[in-house]
């Protein structure tokens, strides 16, 4: 079991409060035509999609700061006695950004107004962070390759010049691979065991549910001290006063593909990445009108695929070997490989020797009863490549698999609700869940038939919760509190679990042979079976509070953060037993150079001469 607890408490002071989670800030200064500071001006920062309003008052130096704003487009309204009303439209706040909007107020009546409709400049002048922001339009319109898995928001990281590689090789800002951190609405989505983007992506919503994200590569604050090189900041979408919805399907189908030049026919390749989103105000006719107050956002994304198996060549024992006949067991030069009787092992003249089986035939009286019960399942698989007995091709690389597939069905659901309480408070709730499976397709597994198939089924399930509360204590003081919880269960198991194996196959002295078909490995043939349940639970939770306070031309930020992450292993991999068989158990003692040594791992199996064995208790 591994766990990680991080606690940080910070106090920052500077000319402005630097945004650092998925939230942003609008800051600036107001002056009169002579350049003097305008003190006590009343400001309203309005989120245009919901009409949610944040209030601020300019300080004694004319400075203002509106902190903890969701990524969106805002309108700034300013009123002060003796000055015309000022309105700045189209102020775009990105994830983790600080936007400076300065204004010069004109003398006049408050009933008069000056309105600026052009977009405010978004150049970062208040900090030295290197940040790449991928905004909503690019998130919606950028094509992502759907290649064997659901679209991942981490695919978008490639647009940042500071990011290199992918998966466990991803590095950001020159940091080491897998040393980055990724956050969803201010809290980490990473796991305690891996910096793999595939794992972290399971704890993030669908690409369609993200409004934007940012990549910070330097200058990030103490709350991200666990990251090396960079921080990926994801912001989830919220509902607005307008109803919106979408439906989509990213399709790949072999019917639209060209045949490979050397192939006789097109390979089966079918994928669908499809889903929908719905968002808007919560309205219950005649009961409740949630415009300007209550909003929802819902999304579902599903991924289904079916890919034809590539031809795979395996090595399987021949039918006569099951009877003990190794007279056709030859090397690549078609020379007989002698099998030696382990029961004749003795010391002679200072050397350990064995006698060969006459005619390379093992008598049935030496067969292991357990081996015979296991071998029953292997007899159905015989060489199928057409090589003649007595040739190398008959005993190795002799089995062609042309069918079977692995499929990876995945479902992802995201639900978010926002409630504006009066003019000073906002509460947000987010729930995201993902179910990922990796298992054989309808035509069976791509390998030996069950129970001999040595692959595993994967079942990964995640849930991510986010709760946030924003409270404008006063025009110059804003508090943001958030809570997060992540659950991530990775489970892998064979296709043979829980099938009453005790009455069919049972290796003596294992913990529980009823749980799983045993795992059998050979040095010259494809192994049989796979391990039972095993995996990790990786729960985590965290608290965070940020208090932003503006006084004079200074902005102060106080806060604390607590993170608790665990990685708790579980499983019973070899609870049904594992046995490895080597040619050395039926070869010339001390000679490990196969095939000159003689011997056969399958002969060792028939006679019960395990080279290595193990079982495992439940953990």
Protein language model features and the residues they cover:
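Short, solvent-exposed loop/turn and secondary-structure capping segments
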Residues: 114, 126-128, 168-169, 183-184, ...
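Periplasm-facing N-terminal accessory domains of Gram-negative outer-membrane beta-barrel systems
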Residues: 2-135, 438
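Membrane-embedded beta-strands that build the outer-membrane beta-barrel scaffold
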Residues: 30, 114-115, 172, 182, ...
């Amino acid at each position: 079991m591994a766990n990680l607890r991080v606690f940080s408490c910070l106090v920052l002071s500077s000319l402005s409060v630097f945004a650092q989670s998925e939230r942003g800030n609008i800051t600036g200064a107001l002056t009169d035509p002579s350049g003097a500071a305008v003190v006590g001006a009343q400001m309203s920062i309005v989120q245009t999609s919901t009409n949610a309003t944040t209030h601020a008052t300019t300080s004694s130096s004319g400075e203002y700061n509106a902190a903890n704003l969701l990524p969106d487009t805002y309108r700034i309204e300013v009123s002060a006695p003796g000055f015309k009303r000022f309105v700045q439209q189209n102020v775009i706040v990105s994830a983790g950004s600080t936007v400076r909007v300065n204004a010069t107020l004109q003398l006049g009546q408050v009933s008069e107004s000056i309105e600026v409709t052009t977009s405010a400049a978004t150049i970062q002048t208040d900090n030295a962070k290197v940040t790449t922001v991928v905004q909503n339009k690019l998130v919606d319109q950028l094509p992502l390759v759907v290649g064997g898995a659901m679209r991942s928001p981490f695919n978008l990281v490639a647009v940042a010049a500071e990011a290199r590689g992918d998966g466990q090789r991803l590095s950001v800002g020159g940091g080491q691979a897998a040393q980055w951190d990724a956050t969803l609405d201010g809290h980490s989505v990473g796991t305690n065991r891996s910096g793999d983007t595939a794992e972290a992506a399971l704890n993030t919503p669908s690409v369609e549910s993200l409004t934007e994200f940012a990549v910070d590569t330097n200058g990030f604050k103490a709350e991200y001290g666990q990251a090396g090189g960079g921080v990926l900041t994801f912001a989830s979408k919220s509902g607005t006063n307008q109803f919106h919805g979408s439906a989509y399907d990213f399709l790949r189908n072999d019917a639209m593909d060209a045949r490979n030049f050397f192939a006789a026919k097109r390979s089966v390749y079918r994928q669908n990445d499809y889903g929908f989103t719905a968002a808007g105000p919560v309205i219950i006719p005649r009961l409740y009108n949630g415009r300007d107050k209550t909003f929802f956002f819902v999304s579902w994304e599903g991924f289904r695929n079916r890919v034809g198996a590539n031809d795979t060549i395996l090595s399987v024992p021949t039918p006569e070997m099951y009877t003990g006949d190794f007279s056709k067991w030859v090397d690549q030069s078609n020379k007989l490989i002698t099998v030696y009787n382990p029961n004749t092992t003795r010391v002679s003249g200072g050397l350990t020797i064995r006698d060969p089986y006459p005619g390379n035939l093992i008598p049935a009286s030496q067969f292991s009863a357990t081996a015979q019960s296991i071998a029953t399942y292997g007899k159905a698989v015989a060489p199928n490549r057409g090589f003649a007995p007595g040739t190398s091709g008959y005993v190795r690389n002799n089995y062609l698999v042309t069918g079977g597939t692995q499929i990876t069905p995945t479902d992802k659901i995201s639900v978010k609700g926002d409630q504006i309480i009066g003019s000073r408070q906002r509460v947000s709730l987010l729930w995201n869940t993902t179910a990922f499976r990796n298992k054989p397709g309808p035509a069976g597994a791509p390998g030996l038939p069950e129970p001999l198939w040595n692959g595993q089924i994967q079942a990964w399930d995640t849930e991510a919760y986010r709760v946030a509360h924003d409270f404008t204590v006063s025009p110059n003081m804003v508090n943001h509190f958030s809570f997060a919880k992540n659950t991530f269960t990775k489970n892998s198991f064979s296709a043979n679990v829980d099938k009453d194996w005790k009455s069919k196959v049972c290796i003596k002295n294992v913990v529980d042979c009823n749980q799983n078909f045993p795992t059998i490995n050979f040095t010259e043939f494809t192994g049989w079976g796979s391990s039972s349940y095993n995996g990790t639970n990786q729960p985590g939770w965290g608290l965070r509070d940020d208090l932003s306070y503006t006084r004079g031309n200074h902005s102060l930020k106080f806060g604390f953060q607590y993170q608790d992450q665990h990685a708790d292993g579980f499983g019973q991999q070899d609870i049904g037993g594992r046995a490895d068989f080597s040619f050395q158990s039926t070869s010339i003692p001390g000679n490990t150079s196969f095939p000159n040594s003689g011997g056969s791992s399958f002969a060792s199996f028939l006679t019960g001469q395990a080279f290595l064995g193990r079982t495992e208790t439940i953990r």
